[in-house]
Amino acid sequence: MREKRTISNKDTNYLKFPNKLQRYSRFLSRKISNTSPEKQPKKNIKEHCLSSYHKEHSVKPKQNSGNVAAKEDKDTQHLQNNVANEEATECLTRSNLKKLQEKIFDRELNDIACDHCLCSTENRRDIKYSRLWFLFELEMSENWNENLRLSCYNKYVYSAIDESWKMENILLKEQEKHYEYFPIGQLLIPNNIDYTNKQKRKENIEDLTIEIDSIIETNHQKKRFLPQSVLIKREDEIAFDDFHLDARKVLNDLSATSENPFSSSPNTKKIKSKGKTLEVVPKKKNKKIIGALERKLHIDEN
């Protein structure tokens, strides 16, 4: 006699699929899901830290209730601050980056206090085009140990914001072969600067002297850029001093060439009246204008 096999309620789905392969795969998936452990939900970082903290302190013997409560509040607050700081340092957002840049700009304009002209706030304000020019000037170096960005800028800006801010000294580093050669000697600030062009200022007012002769302009010769010429001499000398001009001769020459209303002409007639001679200019006859038709018909003027 064969024993009858009974199927449990969990395996009743095994008979729903007609195909054997489908039934077997369904059966295995059910078995795996029953045997696999349940997934626990992830706890929040804050909850996990606080729960572990309370478990540790619950094992310890009870002390005075007032002191314990105050201590627990301080510890929980400290843990919350640490967790908040960890979350803030993990990700860099756009707002955090903007705040950092604003801090850097403020320290560039206010907090750099050194004797270098290139690091001064006046130099920073004079550069109107780009901030990159200001940072490029900080690549200059007084000695070959470090440049101005590493010595001054890092001290007053980067390290003031974060003490762990690290910078690499490129002056002591050899240039690699695959980079374009740059003569780094150009970045060295000269120690001896010639100030001969600048006027030396007296420290005390009593030491100042004034020469009155240099202010008075008597017997002062003007400095000229052009060489001596006739046009330059005309400024000081009267024109036509060395040239004698006869005005009558000039007027007579004009009357001979053209009719001059201010002088006598050959066409004038002299008339005596009451012992005076008067020059009268005869009237001109108006010539009749002959047209083209009259010329063809040979019409006389009279």
UniProtKB/Swiss-Prot annotation:
Pfam families: MAM1. This is Monopolin complex subunit MAM1. Residues 257-268 have a biased composition (Polar residues). Phosphorylated by CDC5. This phosphorylation is required for the location to the kinetochores during late pachytene. Residues 53-83, 257-276 are annotated as: Disordered. GO terms for cellular component: kinetochore; monopolin complex; nucleus. Its main location: nucleus. It comes from the Eukaryota. Keywords: Meiosis, Nucleus, Phosphoprotein. One of its GO terms (biological process) is meiotic sister chromatid cohesion involved in meiosis I. Component of the monopolin complex which promotes monoorientation during meiosis I, required for chromosome segregation during meiosis. Component of the monopolin complex composed of at least CSM1, LRS4 and MAM1. The complex associates with the kinetochore during late pachytene. It is found in: Nucleus.
